[in-house]
Amino acid sequence: LHLCDRRQRQMCIRDSRKYFRINKEGYRQPGVFEYRLITQSKKEYSYGIAISYAAKEIISEWLVRIEKNGSETCIFNRDIDESGENFTFSEVTHKNEAEKIKWEIFLDVFGKNISPAMKKKSILSDVAERSNEKSGVLKEIMDVYEWFQSIIILFPTSQYSGLNQLVEKEEVRKFFSGILKYFDTGIESVESKQGEMNFDRIFEGIPKEHAEKLKIRISNDIENDPVMFKVNNQVYSLRKDEEGNIITTKMMQNHGNPQELFEYSDESDGTQRLFDLIPLFYEHQNNRVIFIDEIDRSLHTNLTRRFLELFYSLTEKSDCQIIATTHDSNLLDLDLVRQDEIWFIKRLEDHSSKMYSLNRYKERYDKKIDKEYLLGRYDAIPIFDEEILEDMND
């Protein structure tokens, strides 16, 4: 399942090879994903979707509202009948007749359009494209869709788009400068350098065919908003001035000599990683869920810990949440995170993975979790087979 560009307002199947490929029959088994979430309206939902990897289509989709007393109210439940040619929907309770009619009209259009493309499309994205209702079932579906669209995902090599504000807004640069100085990076301040766009110079070293595609895409995207992109390990922000000229703004760093500024590409991998992470401090007011893969990548262990402590202090009164993977065992500290917030991933004999919480071990709160983990108490550590080395030496 892929969250497409927000302007396209789509959730669709992009890659059908994400099944468990070690099992030869894995592609025949459906992939089932279910989420428990709280929307901006403070309502709790369970949204689920089942996809067929073989047919490359959605075979089931459902949305349930979780009431405060723990009871469940079905918002919709979509399935495909035995023939595979028709959608079926469960009965839904509506507050009034007007809302019921609107929902039936939506289902009538959705159900009649059971094309191959529609089988790949979620109800969430279809409602987002065709409805602007402010109440009722359609509004609830839209709220859940917006929750998915608000998710921030940072992979080790990804570039968070919040950096666009850094090169465009002075107050953001001041904030960045303070945080970078606090983390002892050697950077005194973050500056910006403007000039007219020179595509040939910026795209130097990139194959001409790819460079031309980038030029076209940037020129189209820049019509509405500033565009940020990264090329040759340098970050640029582009916008059009009043005369239609494309202006580029480049991020620069002052390491103590304002006359000799450093480019983004001059910084260490750890400092560049901080540029990806610091914009997250702005998101605590938006109640977003933030996924970070390898949060500790290229960072000193003390810095990673302090980053999390700062984030926790900012989000104490909000519903913002970080879900991160790490190999830094020093973060396994019950003074930093709760037992139910620590999860391990263990590879099983069939090469599948199993997730389980530290909470199952019911450890004392003064336990040194990092030491116990490295000793193998919780599994989820590499096991070195010395016999393999012996066989290689024979």
What would you call each of these model-derived segments?
Residues 14-26, 335-336:
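Flexible phosphate/Mg2+-sensing switch loops adjacent to catalytic phosphate-binding sites
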Residues 1-9, 13:
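Single conserved hydrophobic/aromatic residue that forms the stacking wall/gate
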Residues 147-289, 360:
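Conserved NTPase motor "head" modules and their coupling/switch loops across ABC/AAA+ ATPases, GTPases
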Residues 46-213:
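Electropositive, glycine-dotted interaction segments
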Residues 33-39, 63, 252-253:
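Short beta-strand segments that buttress and anchor functional surface loops
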Residues 40-44, 256-259:
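Glycine-centered tight beta-turn/hairpin loop motif at sheet-sheet or coil-to-beta transitions
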Residues 27-36, 57-60:
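Short, hydrophobic/aromatic-rich segments at coil-to-beta transitions
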Residues 7-10, 248-388, 392-394:
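Switch/communication elements of ASCE P-loop NTPase nucleotide-binding domains
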